[in-house]
Amino acid sequence: MSELEKAMVALIDVFHQYSGREGDKHKLKKSELKELINNELSHFLEEIKEQEVVDKVMETLDNDGDGECDFQEFMAFVAMVTTACHEFFEHE
């Protein structure tokens, strides 16, 4: 498997490690999203401690307004973070 294919599988795996702990196994609730960000993105994003921050992140990601983050919305988030990191490291 190529590095890109491994990365794609890892993204799917990480999403499903956190989704469905508290409901729909295909979506992240706010608490699941917070845990995922704090555990899996700790080198790129600050730890989320305040509920307001979680609410704001979810509001930004939740395109369909269901109060949860589906895989497509999660991937949009990953793309945003990856783009920001790429731009940061490109200028160093």
From Swiss-Prot:
GO cellular component, one term: neuronal cell body
Tissue: Although predominant among the water-soluble brain proteins, S100 is also found in a variety of other tissues.
Residues reported in the UniProt entry to bind Ca(2+) 1: S19, E22, D24, K27, E32
Domain of life: Eukaryota
The UniProt record lists the keyword Metal-binding: yes
Domain spans labelled EF-hand: 13-48, 49-84
A Pfam family hit: S_100
Positions that bind Ca(2+) 2: D62, D64, D66, E68, E73
CDD domains in the cross-refs: S-100B
PROSITE patterns: EF_HAND_1, EF_HAND_2, S100_CABP
Blocked amino end (Ser) modifications at: S2
SUPFAM superfamilies in UniProt: EF-hand (SSF47473)
An MF annotation (GO) of this entry: identical protein binding
Protein name: Protein S100-B
Species for this entry: Homo sapiens (Human)
